[in-house]
């Protein structure tokens, strides 16, 4: 089984890329976000999930082990496959996805192809496992800080700011000042947005 591939990107497609490893081109499905950040000729390493089902043989690639682990956890939910897991990772940053499940935030998980029943099933079946994960890869460690960050982002979105820039600014502030109070966090974030 393939666990990791390192090679040169030769082609970029809508949902996948071709990774040349020693003269062999592997078609690897990954997030649109990653595809958009790459260019042909670039070297790349991806953690691989090799999916077999009857006559289907697909490779799914992830930039880091944590993304791979999250996709693996999601794929265990009835109705979720790696393609849908990639859609969720494309829609939400890794830390946001983990936070959404930890906070049982159903609205954040509703995307094309995932209805209300499936969102509830994702939360019900993965909640305990996701509680064991760190929600942000750099800086926010305690569950209190995770809650403060989530509340701050929600407040900024309710004030009319887009979620992605709000999340980025909040994480930037919290990485530098993990013990910040929520009111000060929102005030600083408003100044930066």
UniProtKB/Swiss-Prot annotation:
Q: Where is this region: Flexible linker?
A: 149-150
Keyword Cell cycle among UniProt keywords: no
**What is any one GO biological process for this UniProt entry?**
DNA recombination
Q: Which GO terms describe its cellular component?
A: cytoplasm; Holliday junction helicase complex; Holliday junction resolvase complex
Matching entries from SUPFAM superfamilies are given as: DNA helicase RuvA subunit, C-terminal domain, Nucleic acid-binding proteins, RuvA domain 2-like
Highest taxon listed in the record's lineage? Bacteria
Tell me yes or no: is DNA repair among this UniProt entry's keywords: yes
Short name of one Pfam family for this protein? Answer: HHH_5
Q: Which residues cross the membrane?
A: none
Q: How does it assemble?
A: Homotetramer. Forms an RuvA(8)-RuvB(12)-Holliday junction (HJ) complex. HJ DNA is sandwiched between 2 RuvA tetramers; dsDNA enters through RuvA and exits via RuvB. An RuvB hexamer assembles on each DNA strand where it exits the tetramer. Each RuvB hexamer is contacted by two RuvA subunits (via domain III) on 2 adjacent RuvB subunits; this complex drives branch migration. In the full resolvosome a probable DNA-RuvA(4)-RuvB(12)-RuvC(2) complex forms which resolves the HJ.
Which family is annotated?
Belongs to the RuvA family.
What does the comment on domains in this protein's record state?
Answer: Has three domains with a flexible linker between the domains II and III and assumes an 'L' shape. Domain III is highly mobile and contacts RuvB.
- Record-given protein name: Holliday junction branch migration complex subunit RuvA
This protein's species is: Neorickettsia sennetsu (strain ATCC VR-367 / Miyayama) (Ehrlichia sennetsu)
């Amino acid at each position: 089984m393939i666990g990791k591939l390192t090679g040169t990107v030769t082609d970029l497609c809508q949902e996948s890329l071709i990774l040349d490893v020693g003269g062999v081109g592997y078609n690897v499905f990954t997030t649109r976000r990653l595809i958009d950040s790459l260019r042909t000729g670039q070297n790349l390493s991806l953690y691989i999930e090799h999916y077999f089902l009857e006559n289907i043989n697909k490779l799914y690639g992830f930039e880091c082990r944590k993304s791979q682990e999250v996709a693996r956890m999601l794929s265990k939910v009835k109705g979720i496959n790696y393609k849908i897991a990639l859609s969720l990772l494309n829609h939400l940053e890794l830390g946001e996805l983990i936070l959404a499940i930890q906070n049982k935030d159903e609205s954040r998980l509703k995307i094309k192809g995932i209805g209300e029943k499936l969102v509830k099933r994702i939360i019900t079946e993965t909640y305990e496992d996701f509680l064991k994960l760190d929600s942000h890869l750099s800086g926010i460690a305690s569950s209190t800080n995770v809650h403060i960050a989530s509340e701050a982002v929600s407040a900024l979105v309710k004030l009319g700011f887009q979620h992605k820039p709000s999340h980025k600014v909040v994480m930037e502030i919290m990485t530098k000042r993990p013990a910040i109070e929520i009111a000060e966090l929102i005030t600083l974030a408003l100044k930066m947005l």
